[in-house]
Amino acid sequence: MDAQNKEVDALVQKITGLHAAIAKLPSLSPSPDVDALFTDLVTACVPPSPVDVTKLGSEAQEMREGLIRLCSEAEGKLEAHYSDMLAAFDNPLDHLGMFPYYSNYINLSKLEYELLARYVPGRHRPARVAFIGSGPLPFSSYVLAARHLPDAMFDNYDLCSAANDRASKLFRADKDVGARMSFHTADVADLTGELAAYDVVFLAALVGMAAEDKTKVIAHLGAHMADGAALVVRSAHGHVGFLYPIVDPQDIGRGGFEVLAVCHPDDDVVNSVIIAHKSKDVHANERPNGVVDSTRGAVPVVSPPCRFGEMVADVTHKREEFTNAEVAF
């Protein structure tokens, strides 16, 4: 136990140091310094660890919340940078591999599709899909549309109009996937009747960074999605919670959904995935203490085999490749 506590303390100190260094940067736009610090952060946060960020003290929790906000800002700037680079090509979709984390999106989208097919079999061939928080590089929607859902129409929602403008340019030369992609500038809180039209709704990890905000978003989706529609929520587990918000499956249950599966990958997929579906009967299982038993038994937890080393090697290779090419990253 002492050894485990020392490991936890050492990791928290390392993350705290990285947070301090990142917070001092004059800008979070892509640069060698930004790249190096965030690569160190991701490398520290992905391999298995005994850290449970939900049990950290108040000071560490405050640091973690600030770090997630910094990660969100840096991720947005990184994606905008690469979206502009890709838009310079005649067919941007032929060059998506330039993005150093593209393989993670491929594997994450594949995992989400496989979980949908297994736990919500009636929804693994949806006609209409919404992706909330698609950003300037809508890799997830693209991979799902091109590789797994060839007949589905995708509505991508983001708060930022500039992000949507960038995203739409990437599909200008593709008459198949491009014809099935629409981009909308909107706050999910303002979507009501539209949500009832979707068979599946994907909720990006950084939509609602604070726990209370995420809970409100999920409750809003639960109030307006159609009965039986599937919800795919990206979350975090363990010390990946330093990078992304952690979503409590109970909050999804309280939002009007039945939680069907929770996946905490320990391979090269960083995000956890929660699969649920809208159920009008879920509140019939509410207990006297207000906790909703939304799972009909134990929730299956899926953990793929670890391939973390492959992800680190791939990202390192991409960094060297673009440094040699004198491309700002």
UniProtKB/Swiss-Prot annotation:
UniProt record similarity statement: Belongs to the nicotianamine synthase (NAS)-like family.
Gene of this entry: NAS8
EC number: 2.5.1.43
Biological processes per GO annotation: nicotianamine biosynthetic process
Record keywords: S-adenosyl-L-methionine, Transferase
Conditions for induction: Fivefold increase after iron deficiency.
MF terms in GO: nicotianamine synthase activity
Cystine residue pairs: none
Quaternary structure, from the entry: Homotrimer.
Coiled coil: none
Bilayer-crossing regions: none
Keyword Transferase: yes
Entry keyword Transferase: yes
Function: Synthesizes nicotianamine, a polyamine that is the first intermediate in the synthesis of the phytosiderophores of the mugineic acid type found in gramineae which serve as a sensor for the physiological iron status within the plant, and/or might be involved in the transport of iron.
Alphabetical list of InterPro entries matching this protein: Nicotian_synth (IPR004298), SAM-dependent_MTases_sf (IPR029063)
Swiss-Prot/TrEMBL catalytic activity: 3 S-adenosyl-L-methionine = nicotianamine + 3 S-methyl-5'-thioadenosine + 3 H(+)
Protein name per UniProt: Nicotianamine synthase 8
